[in-house]
Amino acid sequence: MGAYKYMQELWRKKQSDVMRFLLRVRCWQYRQLSALHRAPRPTRPDKARRLGYKAKQGYVIYRIRVRRGGRKRPVPKGATYGKPVHHGVNQIKFARSLQSVAEERAGRHCGGLRVLSSYWVGEDSTYKFFEVVLIDTFHKAIRRDPDTQWITKAVHKHREMRGLTSAGKKSRGLGKGHKFHLTIGGSRRAAWKRRNTLQLHRYR
């Protein structure tokens, strides 16, 4: 086994004494920092590399702190207007994961960079912490590398806002295997609408 494989196994055993202590200390450290800050290097080099990170120019790591819990509907004094069925304010569940929210915040803050992917680095009772891998698409090291040229194209601008990252695809019902066969047409909503719409075609 290589060094990265050992590192991967360490992160899998989060209940071990070493990891429990490390995660607890790191959570304390991250809480003292701002909600969005640049990390000098990835906390999990093995995970970052599996997602496409390389320790060379053009790659940037940002650490994001996201508050845990459900999403409250942002309405003044709870006035939602409309029918009682839509009066919910507090028990609303957000459709996307906190990880995709972290990616979106990083993408907004660093408008000139492209979000590649992200991974979990810690959590406590109040916050979850993620590290987001971003790429500077105007750097020569990125533009000249055949492996990263795809992300320099304009179609990949703000891919995190459109649910095109790995974390964003999960909430869209997209993936490989038998669990995702029913999401035909690239949208869970479109698939549901097609199944639940009565279509009476004229016989010609």
From Swiss-Prot:
Transmembrane segments: none annotated. It comes from the Eukaryota. GO terms for biological process: cytoplasmic translation. SMART domains: Ribosomal_L15e (SM01384). InterPro entries: Rbsml_eL15_core_dom_sf, Ribosomal_eL15, Ribosomal_eL15_CS, Ribosomal_uL23/eL15/eS24_sf. SUPFAM superfamilies: Ribosomal proteins S24e, L23 and L15e. It holds the Pfam family Ribosomal_L15e. It is found in: Cytoplasm. One of its GO terms (molecular function) is RNA binding. Keywords: Cytoplasm, Ribonucleoprotein, Ribosomal protein. GO terms for cellular component: cytosolic large ribosomal subunit. Component of the large ribosomal subunit. Component of the large ribosomal subunit. The ribosome is a large ribonucleoprotein complex responsible for the synthesis of proteins in the cell. Belongs to the eukaryotic ribosomal protein eL15 family. This is Large ribosomal subunit protein eL15. The lineage of its organism: Eukaryota, Metazoa, Chordata, Craniata, Vertebrata. The gene is rpl15.
